[in-house]
Regions:
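Cys/His-coordinated zinc-finger cores
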Residues: 79-83
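Right-hand nucleic-acid polymerase module
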Residues: 1-75, 86-228
């Protein structure tokens, strides 16, 4: 699985399992407590996860996590994790290797940038710490693994760089991408539509086009909406 595919799949997973109540946590090692090798880091994470699962069970919930290691060229080590909500004080008591940074995840439900960071950290560690390889990220087994529906359009002139956004959805403009597929050799055009949680009446659908010269997304049909 290449980087682009890994980011796309991880984005689907994060979007399907986390929301504004979830947390993005970085567990950092103090300099004198850094792991000597990948096996030691994994052992530390396994101990941490046992504590998290026990704490979540006691609170009446089930831990849902995704984590990746980050090891710098000079040995600085961190563990990055997405986790459903857990009490901050409880979490602090589970990590005795240094300090933790906790950031609430936003309520957008769209975590492509976070997925890209996770894959970047993972690839960085594969280069700086011998022994890390294989998986781009690690996760609990209870996560929802979405499988998006795919439709192949074979009609003539169907591929015209036009995106019609149906009522109740909006276009994630940063997701629009056109490139040559590294395996098939065919050109592909991809984008993400996000379900809009805001209730509003729409008379017309938004239509967007990709400007091939500038690479920018242009609105070709203005949306007409009535606010409640």
């Amino acid at each position: 699985m290449n980087s682009r595919q890994a980011i796309k799949k991880l984005t689907w997973i994060l979007n399907a399992n986390y929301d504004g109540t979830s947390q993005y946590i970085t567990f950092s090692y103090a300099k004198d407590k850094r792991p000597e090798n990948p096996a030691a880091l994994r052992k530390d994470v396994e101990k941490l996860l046992r504590g998290i699962r026990a704490a979540q069970k006691k609170a009446g919930t089930v831990a849902k996590y995704v984590w990746v290691p980050e090891v710098g060229e000079r040995g600085a080590a961190h563990v990055h994790m997405c986790l459903n909500h857990i009490d901050t004080q409880v979490l602090k008591g589970l990590w005795d290797k240094g300090w933790i940074t906790i950031k609430p995840m936003d309520d957008s439900g769209q975590y492509a940038k976070l997925a890209a960071y996770f894959v970047k950290y993972s690839e960085k560690t594969m280069k700086t710490a011998e022994g890390f390889g294989g998986k781009r990220y690690n996760s609990s087994r209870n996560l929802v693994i979405p499988e998006p529906e795919k439709t192949t359009i074979r009609s003539r002139n169907a591929y015209n760089h036009t995106i019609q956004v149906p009522s109740g959805w909006y276009l994630d403009k940063e997701s629009v991408r056109e490139a040559w597929h590294e395996v098939t050799g065919f050109m592909y055009f991809t984008y993400t539509l996000v379900k809009n949680g805001k209730k509003r009446k729409q008379k017309n659908r938004d239509t967007y086009s990709l400007n091939l010269e500038t690479g920018e997304i242009e609105i070709t049909e203005n949306q007409q909406a009535e606010r409640n």
